[in-house]
């Protein structure tokens, strides 16, 4: 890739139909883990006009009112009016959960001689990524895209823009010069709204109240292209506008396309599923590599075989930004991080009901106290082992 280029990422709000599905799935996961932390959960959700379908595989001793959890999640998001196409009070909720296959369970539950040798719940490959473009060590385009739709939700909730409705999408294009963010080129924001708002008034308010306060002043250089509701009217949205499904926003959930994705979604899955837990561990590893000053960009890939505890591969790529070799960093990762599935669960304390909060505005790059995978507590040890200087904030 050339050093001067445009790069774009997108995000969606909590009211987007796919995110409604993700949040219901993770709310159900949390409700189960709160009672039985060793549950096996793969909770999938479909939501459409006036309808929510809950399906998947759950093995647990917990007694959870799944229908009530789904309704409370829809209420929290803001779908509390039949005019919005789905109303938490009146929507139909169908439940069709099965138990986890015993063929899968025999590999996942096996302990061998060491209780950390729990097998992976499936084969697969997962990626983690970090870079020094933001204080959170995230790519700038996805970071800004998340903040835009998060602000849209905040202004909707506090009543400052009362004509906003829950569904929204954002997209940010950044101009890079010499491989670093230089300026903001284009911002797209489409928001659902009440039918009585004038489009000109909406566009002015969105630019002045949502977009401009979110953009870093140092990246405003020349004219930025603002595209607000470019198709015009956006009254029908949410699950009425599109059928929502768990796991359809995996790029929004991660790095906005700035890093590869192994293909496995996160929401609704307990941490025995390496699709989720190993991706969280990958973020933890990559963020600590960058925080340690070992590189300004770091990508890690890990892979697993079902029923086998040790990863089948570990790879680190620092894209030529490493202060030491990628082979050295890979060795340090294997020395300082336990990437067996149960080792990850213990390292990041993942048997907690913390997942509903992850299901909107990104699983990574948010300094939430529950997000243990965002900690940089290994950075100093990595820096010492590699002979590098950690970033100033950690020194």
UniProtKB/Swiss-Prot annotation:
Pfam families per record: S-AdoMet_synt_C, S-AdoMet_synt_M, S-AdoMet_synt_N
Any one Gene Ontology BP term: S-adenosylmethionine biosynthetic process
E.C. numbers: 2.5.1.6
List of residues binding Mg(2+): 18
Broad EC category: transferase
Keyword Nucleotide-binding carried by entry: yes
SUPFAM superfamilies in alphabetical order: S-adenosylmethionine synthetase
Subcellular location, principal: cytoplasm
Cofactor: Mg(2+); K(+)
Pathway in which this enzyme or protein is active: Amino-acid biosynthesis; S-adenosyl-L-methionine biosynthesis; S-adenosyl-L-methionine from L-methionine: step 1/1
An example Gene Ontology CC term for this record: cytoplasm
Swiss-Prot/TrEMBL keywords: ATP-binding, Cytoplasm, Magnesium, Metal-binding, Nucleotide-binding, One-carbon metabolism, Potassium, Transferase
Localisation: Cytoplasm
PROSITE patterns reported for this sequence: ADOMET_SYNTHASE_1 (PS00376), ADOMET_SYNTHASE_2 (PS00377)
Segments for region (Flexible loop): 100-110
Binding site for ATP: 16, 167-169, 233-234, 242, 248-249, 265, 269
Annotated positions binding L-methionine: 57, 100, 242, 273
Comment on bound cofactor: Binds 2 divalent ions per subunit. Binds 1 potassium ion per subunit.
PANTHER family xrefs: S-ADENOSYLMETHIONINE SYNTHETASE
Homology family: Belongs to the AdoMet synthase family.
Annotated protein name in UniProt: S-adenosylmethionine synthase
Species per Swiss-Prot/TrEMBL record: Paraburkholderia phymatum (strain DSM 17167 / CIP 108236 / LMG 21445 / STM815)
């Amino acid at each position: 890739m050339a050093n001067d280029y445009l790069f774009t990422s997108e995000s969606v709000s909590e009211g987007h139909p796919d995110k409604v599905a993700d949040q219901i799935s993770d709310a159900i996961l949390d409700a189960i883990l709160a009672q039985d932390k060793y549950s096996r959960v793969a909770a999938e959700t479909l939501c459409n006009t006036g309808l929510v379908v809950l399906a998947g595989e759950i093995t647990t001793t917990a007694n959870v009112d799944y229908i009530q959890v789904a309704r409370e999640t829809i209420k929290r998001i803001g779908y509390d009016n039949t005019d919005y196409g789905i109303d938490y009070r009146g929507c139909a909720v169908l439940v069709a959960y099965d138990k986890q296959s015993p063929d899968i369970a025999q590999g996942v539950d096996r302990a061998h001689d060491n209780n950390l040798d729990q097998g992976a719940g499936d084969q697969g490959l997962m990626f983690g990524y970090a870079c020094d473009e933001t204080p959170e060590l995230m790519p700038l385009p996805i970071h800004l895209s998340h903040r835009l739709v998060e602000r849209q939700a905040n202004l909707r909730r506090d009543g400052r823009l009362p004509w906003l409705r829950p569904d929204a999408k954002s997209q940010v294009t950044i101009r890079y010069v010499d491989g670093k963010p230089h300026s903001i080129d284009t911002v797209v924001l489409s928001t659902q709204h009440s039918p009585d708002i004038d489009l000109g008034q909406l566009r002015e308010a969105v630019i002045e109240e949502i977009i401009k306060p979110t953009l870093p002043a140092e990246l405003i250089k020349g004219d930025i292209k603002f595209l607000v509701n470019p198709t015009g009217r956006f009254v029908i949205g949410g699950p009425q506008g599109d059928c929502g499904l768990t796991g359809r926003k995996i790029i929004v959930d991660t790095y906005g396309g700035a890093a590869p994705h192994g293909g496995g979604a996160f929401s609704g899955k307990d941490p025995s599923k390496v699709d989720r837990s190993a991706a969280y561990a990958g973020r933890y590893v990559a963020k600590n590599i960058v925080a340690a000053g070992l590189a300004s960009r770091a990508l890690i890939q890990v892979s697993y075989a079902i029923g086998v505890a040790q990863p089948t591969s570990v790879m680190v790529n620092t894209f030529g930004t490493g202060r030491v070799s990628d082979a050295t960093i890979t060795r340090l990762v294997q020395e300082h991080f336990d990437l067996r599935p149960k080792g990850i669960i213990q390292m990041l304390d993942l048997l907690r009901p913390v997942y509903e909060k992850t299901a909107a505005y990104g699983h990574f790059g948010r300094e939430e106290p529950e997000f243990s995978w965002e900690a940089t507590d290994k950075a100093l040890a990595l820096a010492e082992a590699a002979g590098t200087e950690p970033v100033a904030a950690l020194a």
